[in-house]
């Protein structure tokens, strides 16, 4: 039975309802429980805080989880607030900032600061983790990779000696020779061939005969086939049972040593260095199959992602150090990541500066290590190649002419001169060009004609021109027909000396020459006057005084008929019309049908 706070037998809240959540063996004591005073009713006296806390018993751990009064702290009447939670939220950073690649770069900076003035070059991991503001367990993977690269060596608990990465080319030379001795290039090649080939799978009910094989006829006595790979280089050799058991124990012991993070890092570099110089790259599936599984006993199927998790951490640290880079390739329509070796060349006498390599990565925007995050630029290029980011109209489709686009017929004429505007704009209306050119040509023709008349009038009075203009000298001979002209008779002017010619020369008063054209006959002008210039006779006043009646009235029609009869008009409504008009009350004799009527 549940009770309510404030009663004499106040125990707990909702104990009966939460019996299934109470751990077995938990005992509850009957203790009085008092609610704290509401915040509103509390006194604001500063000395109130110095008072002794009320003797309220502390609830048990189980009770603090089950009861609704769990907001009480174990100090008495203090109430927990969300201030501490808000402070914790401010310290929370994004996952990208916690990535292993960025932690590796910060680790190198912290190691450099710790070993600058040290003669022993010994570092303390807790000091480095405190300087990086991370937990100590977060840098263990980085330390293991550094141990695999002979950069750090453990001297004591949490103490390591920094040896540097200057001898990294010599280490790569030794790893490459070890990979060749173990035959690692052949194993990598077999795994790549197995993953890129098709393998025939036999039916589990192969003994039933031809019913399991669709589309073929096989006799019932035929033996089922066994699965075989599609390449000839892989062969299964039968070995004695004792040799297989001994080999399995050795492989198990060797596999246990190779599963460590340091050994896995070395063998991953061996897989990369086993390829030639120009193709030192391997996919994640091939590397995980060669390093984590035994392909000859477990098959060529890539291991699960959970088993490859340690290989991911190794690759992220090596990417941050600038030894490898992650590139995405297309295998058919599937995007697969490849790790490409970009570290120092294997050499016994070479040296390597890891800090310079990291600075080069940070300065280059294309090679910034983003560890588990795919590079935006690479992802965009892969999507365009694979067709994931299709567009409605690509640049190639825009350059091609559409089939529904109407074509404008081009008018080419020798008479129309090409203008710059016409050459630049192909969509210009050619009819307007022709009209504009014709109007401009007509204006030029009129201007030249007027100029020629002016020249002819002035040339007639100049003494220096004794002969008429020839056709070659006239500016408009190709456009105007020659006019019949009589020979000009110009009077001879008296000669005057040259010094006084400019002052005393004047044109003599001569009569204006008249030209006689025998073929010319004047035509009377047919120009009519304007409407505003025309005069009309005024109407008589009698017409204005007449009472004009509508023409559709019967009396008007009869009156017009009488007027026309008086004017000896042959048309009369009463006799000659097809529809005779008869006044009211007047009758006419009927005539026989077919009788010829007198129309006079």
From Swiss-Prot:
Probable transcription factor which represses gene expression in a subset of ventral nerve cord neurons. Involved in regulating programmed cell death and determining cell fate during development, acting in a partially redundant manner with lin-39 to repress the BH3 domain-encoding gene egl-1 in the VA and VB motor neurons. This is Transcription factor efl-3. It is found in: Nucleus. One of its GO terms (cellular component) is RNA polymerase II transcription regulator complex. SUPFAM superfamilies: Winged helix' DNA-binding domain (SSF46785). The lineage of its organism: Eukaryota, Metazoa, Ecdysozoa, Nematoda, Chromadorea. InterPro entries: E2F, E2F_WHTH_DNA-bd_dom, WH-like_DNA-bd_sf, WH_DNA-bd_sf. Coiled coil: none annotated. Keywords: Developmental protein, DNA-binding, Nucleus, Transcription, Transcription regulation. Belongs to the E2F/DP family. Residues 35-65 are annotated as: Disordered.
């Amino acid at each position: 039975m549940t009770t309510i706070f404030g009663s004499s037998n106040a125990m707990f809240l909702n104990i009966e309802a939460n019996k299934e959540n109470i751990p077995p063996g938990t005992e509850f004591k009957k203790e009085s429980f008092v609610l704290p005073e509401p915040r509103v009713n509390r006194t604001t006296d500063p000395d109130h805080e110095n008072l002794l806390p009320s003797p309220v018993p502390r609830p048990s751990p189980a009770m603090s989880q089950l009861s609704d009064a769990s907001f009480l702290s174990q100090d008495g009447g203090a109430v927990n607030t969300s201030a501490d939670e808000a402070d914790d939220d401010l310290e929370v950073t994004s996952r990208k900032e916690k990535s292993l690649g960025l932690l590796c770069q910060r680790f190198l900076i912290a190691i450099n600061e710790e070993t600058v003035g040290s003669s022993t070059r010994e570092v303390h991991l807790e000091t480095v983790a405190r300087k990086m503001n991370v937990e100590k367990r977060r840098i263990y993977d980085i330390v293991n990779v550094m141990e695999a690269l002979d950069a750090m060596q453990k001297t004591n608990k949490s103490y390591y000696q920094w040896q540097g990465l200057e001898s990294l080319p010599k280490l790569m030379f030794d790893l490459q020779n070890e990979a060749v001795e173990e035959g690692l290039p052949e194993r990598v090649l077999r795994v790549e061939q197995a993953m890129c080939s098709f393998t025939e799978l036999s039916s589990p009910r192969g003994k039933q005969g031809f019913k399991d094989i669709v589309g073929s006829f096989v006799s019932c006595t035929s033996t089922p086939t066994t699965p075989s790979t599609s390449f000839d280089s892989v062969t299964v050799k039968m070995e004695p049972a004792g040799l297989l058991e001994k080999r399995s124990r050795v492989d198990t012991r060797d596999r246990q040593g190779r599963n460590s993070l340091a050994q896995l890092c070395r063998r991953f570099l061996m897989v990369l260095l086993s390829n030639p110089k120009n193709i030192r790259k391997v996919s994640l599936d091939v590397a995980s199959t060669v390093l984590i599984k035994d392909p000859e006993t477990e098959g060529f199927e890539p291991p699960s992602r959970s088993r490859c998790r340690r290989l991911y951490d190794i690759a992220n640290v090596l990417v941050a150090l600038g030894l490898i880079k992650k590139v995405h390739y297309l295998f058919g329509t599937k995007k697969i990541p490849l790790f490409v070796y970009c570290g120092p060349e294997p050499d016994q006498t070479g040296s390597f500066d890891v800090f310079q390599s990291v600075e080069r990565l940070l300065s280059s925007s294309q090679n910034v290590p983003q560890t588990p995050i795919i590079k935006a630029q690479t992802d965009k290029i892969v999507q365009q190649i694979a067709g994931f980011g299709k567009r409605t109209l690509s640049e190639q489709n825009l350059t091609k002419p559409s089939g529904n686009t109407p074509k404008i017929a081009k008018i080419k004429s020798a008479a129309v001169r090409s203008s710059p505007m016409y050459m630049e704009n192909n969509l210009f209306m050619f009819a307007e060009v022709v009209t504009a050119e014709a109007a401009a040509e007509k204006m030029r023709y009129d201007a030249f004609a007027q100029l020629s008349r002016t020249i002819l009038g002035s040339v007639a009075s100049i003494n220096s021109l004794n002969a008429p203009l020839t056709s070659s000298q006239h500016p408009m001979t190709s456009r105007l027909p020659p006019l019949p002209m009589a020979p000009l008779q110009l009077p001879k002017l008296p000669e005057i000396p040259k010094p006084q010619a400019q002052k005393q020369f004047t044109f003599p008063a001569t009569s204006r020459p008249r030209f006689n054209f025998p073929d010319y006959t004047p035509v009377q002008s047919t120009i009519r006057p304007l409407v505003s210039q025309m005069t009309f006779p005024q109407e008589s006043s009698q017409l204005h005084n007449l009472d004009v009646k509508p023409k559709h009235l019967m009396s008007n029609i009869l009156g017009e008929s009488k007027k026309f009869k008086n004017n000896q008009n042959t048309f009369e409504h009463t006799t000659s019309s097809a529809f005779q008009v008869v006044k009211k009350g007047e009758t006419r004799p009927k005539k026989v049908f077919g009788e010829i009527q007198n129309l006079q």
